[in-house]
Every structure is written in structure tokens, then in C-alpha cells.
């Protein structure tokens, strides 16, 4: 392999290191290890047919060429996407900072205080702007937030409504079309009927349980919904409102006129359009609905010494605990983008946000008055940033389109011939003059250029916001770049990311996110593209999307790909909806059961329920495999109604099951489909694939296998790949003329981060990707060999090897000493490591996945850490350490505790803080001691204003 290829930088183990590791494992070669790990009958016979790998320099030139094919016109299409200004201090110190983008979802509270605080800022900003008491820390986008709102309101129906079968949701006709489409996809399998029309004409019938409104609406008109909301509540109907978050700086917020749920996108709070995504959806509601709310919620708590801290609250609602009974299948959301939006509000504060909104509104008012003087009729009576014009008889929309394109401007063109425009943060006087000139030329009239646009408003007193927002001190302290930079740095020092050390989370694949893959995201031609521009303006994006889709087909062995799902859970849902659509097309729509192994990730049953299926659990045997007898029995018992099997491969137990082909055959013999969860695809690439094994559909986690970063809990991409017979049923998009099974607002989902995976595949090539897979398996087996004689490995494959991850036995330790897997996880923090995956898929264990990116020296340091912790456990077992006062149950040890004048433990400060030599050179200090989880759930405080009595 050439030394200037990415594979040499991405893969952490060199040839000499591998030989040392193979000797420890007990095999003669890497090929022998792979042959003994992966069943021979599923091994690919030929290398992946992918383009030759590019060097980093060659890829930089190639991606620049693609970017150059994108034409950056000034776009006023709106419809949920707006140009914005990302403050450089946020772009440089957050968006482009690996400390922020390589961190994991903040389950481990003590090593996540920085991003938890940043997400708390986001929640507070959302609550303030919407005037609601509770918000989560992001959803995937506005459209999926709308679908979640409808599902939540359906679950909140009164007992009488449920008995009466109330199943109708009213959606105002002036909602964004992509939002209606995604709601429709979600509603159909849940037997929710959608009724659309004008909100003023609605008759509140007994079968109605909820209403969804847009504010301002899709035309840009800001309606006064107060009377309607009162009527809805009188009729026992909930009201959800899709609100433009920036408009709420000027408009009366929905929380003040009775909304039950307020949702939308925070894209215009400093997040580029990225050809549709990613951006952080938001979701706010009433406090009494907190246990019904989808998504993650950050709340206050205290550590064991009483220090205030943050944590993820009310996790018992979520899929990883409640599984099929969860409030939602949401897992990965948009944490990095929510963090950026939160910092945007912190940086600008109340005055800055109001000034931005007022400037946008003033320019809109100026344009309405000026264009109306040219003979155009503007239809919106109350508006924030959007105008819709009826054209005079002498002017056609095509004339305006031609003139606009000649000036490199995109406007919105309605089906009836009207023309619209939405002003944004980047619009200045010069841009306003160009817009005015387009309409003047079309009308054949002169116009007067202006040098300044005065502040103005047309918002009525009834709709004008009177209440303050962003009043917490965090929104007023950091308005200089110096202070903002230091604040961001203070927060990132509190967190463990890949910039600190290996993150060995099983089933999460925390691999390198190479700088060469990340750089294109900061390119304006990729950042500033609206998803609904004419196709020729997005030629570079379209070529990249086509190339990436073809490469994913090759890697998975499938015939079709959809890049639309915004997360792995969204991919599961999309794949199951695709299966359902196919079954309905062949007269098998009655099939409504999905078989799921007991070891499956919680998103599997949650997604199946969301897609309208019921779940049947299949047992696993003592070796961690699917119990074949139970599988056959369950498949036979349910064969007439069986729609699919959902199975992860290699399994969540970390092994390649030898009967996987037979498993697929059993399911197909019942007339059902095989859904392969691609969470563990990092152990397949180049060696086997779902299509070759016999699956019909799989989703991929680009933020796992394909090098896109986790971002502290998103963004992710969960594309689905399908066999030939399922291709016609893949998600489409109504705005592109193919409305079916839409699962996200944008046609290509989070298109803005696709260059990462594209770069990974293009620079690794077939040989590099295959070597990455082999090395991931090598690294996992090396750790297993090093730790098997102490902790023990719960499951191994047929020949005694693990796949790319392993489950470490901790249950016996607990029985003998009272030291739990959680204590071990917390103690790892003192050594500078993030915890592995706790108690999944087996309670009382740790699941470890090292990935191919880690070097032998890092693996050895982790082994030394785990063995030192093992010795600490033995000290407790042998009575050398106090069972009630030892380094494990007291872990982690924050700096403030170690340097305190009060030290009452029976072990030394040095043992607590510097247990091995490497820690002295690279000490990570947790910011808080062990956090009180019960307190944080007992009293949920989801904003910066919260405090404990």
C-alpha cells in the first residue's frame, strides 16, 4: 500500500505492530484470523469494485472540482431554509473543532459537562423564544419534529377519545409541503387520518384529536391563531405549531397564545443550509407532557458533593431502555448543530437576535412597499420575512424567472403563477436593490436605488412580541470574540473526545474522522446551497450524491440507495416503510409482524412500532447466537403475518453467527423480508456484505462505519440500501415530483455531510476499506486476548474469536465485591478514558469496540488501564481496600476534590488521580464528581434558570 494514501494515516496499526498482536492472539497471520472469525460461506470472492484510491491531495483537488460545479446564486426561496451567517468564532472553535465533533452522546455525565452546558443553552433559547417551559436538545429537522408532534398528541388522547376512536389530525393547508409529506408517512401506519383545509373553516368534530399550524404560514402570512386555539382546546384538541424560531424575536410566541407543542428548525440560527441539512430541529412543550416528549432532555442535577451539574434526564422514556414502549425511536439527533445554534444565541444575546430579526423584517417591509408601487400585489397582511406577489397581467412568472436567473437570483415560484421571496440575515441594501430591479425590469418601469433602509414594521400590536427573552446571564456575558472563544474553550476542556483518547464504545464505532474528509464542509459551495435550487445549480452536489450512492451499492451488494434518512433510527424506519410498501404492492399488506432478536438495539423494536408493525421477540442461546429452534418456531407460528426479521450482523454480542444464511432462508420461506441493521457494518466492509448474505434491506450509519463524526449526538446519516425488488419503494420527495414515503424534510437528508463519507471511500479505496475492516477485527481480538484471563469475554464465535467488538464480563466482579460495571466505567474517567458501552446488550457487562484507527500504543495503554483497575478490584476483594471507601466506588475524582484540604479517603490522592504513569503526561480532570441521577429525574429543570431548593 502506498504510504501517501489515507489508509496509512487512518489505520492505527502498522505491519510490525500487527505481528506482535497476532502472536498474542495466537494466530500466524491476519488472514488466518479473518478466516477463523468470518464464516467461509459468506466471504466475498473478489475485491470491491471501487475506484482506485486518491491521495489526500488528489481528493482535495477532486472535491474542489465538484464544488466548482455548484453555482452559488443568491437564493430567496425560503420554505424552511435560509441563508445565515455563522459567526467565525463558532465555525472555527466548534464546527471545525474535533473536540466538539468527535465526542459521543453525553450518556457519561461526568465527562460531558461542556457539551451538556452548551445543549442546556440551546434548550433555554428555544424555551425563551417559544415561551414554552420545556424543550428537548434537538430533533432531526422540522418535518420529523412535526411527525413526532402528531405521534405524541395521538398518544395523549383522553380516555374518551381513545374509546371513541378519535384518529383525525387537522393540518392547515398552508403548512410547508415537505412537513405535510413526512407527517403523512408517519401517520399512515398508525391509522391516523389527516384532514387538511383552511384553519378558519374547520369544524371540530368528535373524531378530531389535534391540529397542526404553521407560524408564519407557508405563504409567509402571520395569522392570529388565538381564537382558533381556544376553540381547539374547548373541543379537547391539542394544538402544535411549526414556528420560525427567528420570527419569534418579533412575533407573539405560540406559548403565549396557548400552543401545546411548538416545533421547527433552528437552521437560521447560524447553521448553513448545506443543501438541506443537517440542522437542529427543535421541540418544545408543556411540563405536564415531559414523559411523553420525544428526544433527549438536558436537566440540572448535583454531584455527590452538592456541586451543580448537568445530565441527560428522564432517559427511561427512550428507546435504549423502553424499546417497543418508547416515546420515539429517536437516538442520534443533531447535537453539534444544536450546540452551534445555542452558541449563536449566546454570542448575539437578546439585543443581537432582535436586531437581526428587525433588520430582516425592515428590508422585507421596504421591498413590499417598493415592489407594490411597480404594480405587483402583495397578499400577506402580516408577515415577518416572506412576501407573495400576484403578478400584473403584463408580467409572467417566466419573465421574472429569466431576469432573476440572469442576475444569479433564485425566487420562489408558486404553481398558480405567483412569485415569492424570503429575506434572510445575509440580505443587505445592495441585495435589496437587485431584487427590486428584477421586478422593475419585468414591469418595464424605473426604480430608485436606495443607500439605506430604515427600520420599519407592519406587525400589528396583537401579534407584536411584548415579552423579553434570553434574559439569563449566559446570553449577555460573551459578546466579544475573546470572551466567546474562551467560553467555548472552557466548555470543551470538560469533555472527553477522540482528541483526548480512544473511545471504546461498543456498537458505536468511534473511529477517526480525518481532517481531509472534514475540510470540504467549510467550503461555501457546499455550505450555502439551498436544497430546492434548480438542478443545474447543484451539479456538483448531484454528482457527489450519485457517486456515493453507486459506491454504497457496491459495498452493500444492493441495487438501490436512499440517502434521505437523517440518522440510523430514521434509516430503520425508512427501511421498514419500504418493506411495508412493497408488501402492500403484492397484496401482502396484512403482514404486520416483525421478528427481532432479544439482543437487538432498542431502536429496532421502537422503529418497528413506529412503522406500524407489532414485534415478536426471538431468544438468543447461551453462546450469544440467535436461538435457531426458537427462530424456526416463531417464524412458523407467525408465517402468515410475518413481514420481516430485523437482525444485526455481526450480532450485538460481537460475533459472526455461522447460521446467518440459513436465518435469511427461513424468513424468506415464510414470505417475509430480511432487514439487516448496519450498526456493525464496520466488520463487514470488503469481506462480506448484506446482499451477498441474503438480506433485502439494510441501513448504514455513516457516523459509524463511514467516518462521519458523532458530533456529541448527531448529525448522523442513515442511508438505506435495498435489493432490486424494493427499489421502486424507496423514499421519494414531493418537491421533486416523487411523493412517497418521505422521511425527512430535505430530498437528500443531511447532504452537507455526505462529502465526509465520499472522501473516506474515495481516499481509502477497496484495499484500504478492506484493511480497515480486518484491522478493526484484529484490534478487538487483541484486546480480548489481553483481558480474557482477568475479566473474561462473555461471547466468542465458533472458533473462539470475537468480531470487531467484545463483551467484557463484570457480573462476577459485582457478586464478589459489590463493584459494578458502572463503577468501572466511572473509574476509567480518572485514567482519561470514556466508558465503554454499559449493560448492553447484556446487563452487568461492558461492551468494547476499539476500531481500526487506534494504535498499538493506545491499545496497550487501555489494556494497562483495565488491568490496573482489575488489580484495584482485587484489592477490594482481598480486603486490602475498604469496600465502602475505595477508588472505584468513589470515582471519578474531580480536581477540586483531589486538591481540597479535606481528604478523608483511606487511599492516597496520588492513587485517586495518577494511578499509572501515562496519566501524569496527559491528565484529564473531570469537572464534577459522580452525579446524582435520581435527583435530576425527580425534579426536572430543563433551562439555565433552573435551581434546586
Swiss-Prot record:
InterPro entries: GcvP, GDC-P_C, GDC-P_N, GDC_P, PyrdxlP-dep_Trfase, PyrdxlP-dep_Trfase_major, PyrdxlP-dep_Trfase_small. It catalyses: N(6)-[(R)-lipoyl]-L-lysyl-[glycine-cleavage complex H protein] + glycine + H(+) = N(6)-[(R)-S(8)-aminomethyldihydrolipoyl]-L-lysyl-[glycine-cleavage complex H protein] + CO2. The keyword Oxidoreductase applies. GO terms for cellular component: cytosol; glycine cleavage complex. One of its GO terms (molecular function) is pyridoxal phosphate binding. GO terms for biological process: glycine decarboxylation via glycine cleavage system. CDD domains: GDC-P. It comes from the Bacteria. Its cofactor is pyridoxal 5'-phosphate. Gene3D superfamilies: Aspartate Aminotransferase, domain 1, Type I PLP-dependent aspartate aminotransferase-like (Major domain). The glycine cleavage system is composed of four proteins: P, T, L and H. Belongs to the GcvP family. The glycine cleavage system catalyzes the degradation of glycine. The P protein binds the alpha-amino group of glycine through its pyridoxal phosphate cofactor; CO(2) is released and the remaining methylamine moiety is then transferred to the lipoamide cofactor of the H protein. This is Glycine dehydrogenase (decarboxylating). It comes from Bacteroides fragilis (strain YCH46).
